[in-house]
Amino acid sequence: MCRMLLVSILIILVGCQTSPSTEDSLKLYVMDCGELGFTDISLFSVSNDETAVRTMFVPCYLIDHPEGTLLWDAGLDPALVGKGRRSEDGMYQVYEKSVMDQVREIGHAPDEINLMALSHMHFDHTGSANYFPNVRLLIQRAEHHAAFNAPEENPIFDYALYKDLLDNPKMILDGDHDVFGDGKVMIISAPGHTPGHQVLFVDLPETGPLVLSGDLYHFRLSRAEKR
């Protein structure tokens, strides 16, 4: 699932990071890849009376670096786009504009994106993975095994959403990884939510370092009490 409040703060602080002075500087684009809503949040180890929050923003990010472009997370299934609120089993999903269209608005075609890294392989992070045909997937070894060798053992994995990545080139990681070799974009291993959950450190030229923390936490309370 998607952590919400921490990501919302990042959006306020970061937005689309573009340096007006240097065309080749590192840029981070924040994209809206859907929304989830819940009638019962106890599945997140938080009781319903501990917070009034019931909706979660689903973000995707595009990192534009002089050495390549990295899509971080792929949001909800684009089949939801234009369908309004879809409700099932106490959860609703809404998705208004596909990540592919948002990437095009930034100035890239989906087939120009050359790297993809997903915080983890749950359905709300892999929805559009099949629509970026030329990416090299950067994935932790444990997550790769769970997603491609035993997806039926992981009920929130939806293999159909990322099956086209099976034959894509991959970099199988066993821990942290410097994506572009300059320390500016670092994948950090953070297992727990899934076997190979990972987070992304980005050091932006104007606003400095931040962490895109995937589903490390879902609520402020989760972070404060380490739930």
Give the predicted meaning of each segment:
Residues L13-D124, R136, Q140-P191, T207-G214, ...:
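Metallo-beta-lactamase
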Residues M4-L13:
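Bacterial N-terminal signal peptides
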Residues W72, S119, I139-Q140, G192, ...:
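Active-site flanking residues adjacent to catalytic metal/cofactor-binding acidic residues
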Residues N130-P133:
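Short, conserved loop/helix-junction motifs that constitute active-site signature segments
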Residues G37-T39, A79, M121-G127, H145-A146, ...:
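Active-site environment of divalent metal-dependent phosphoester hydrolases
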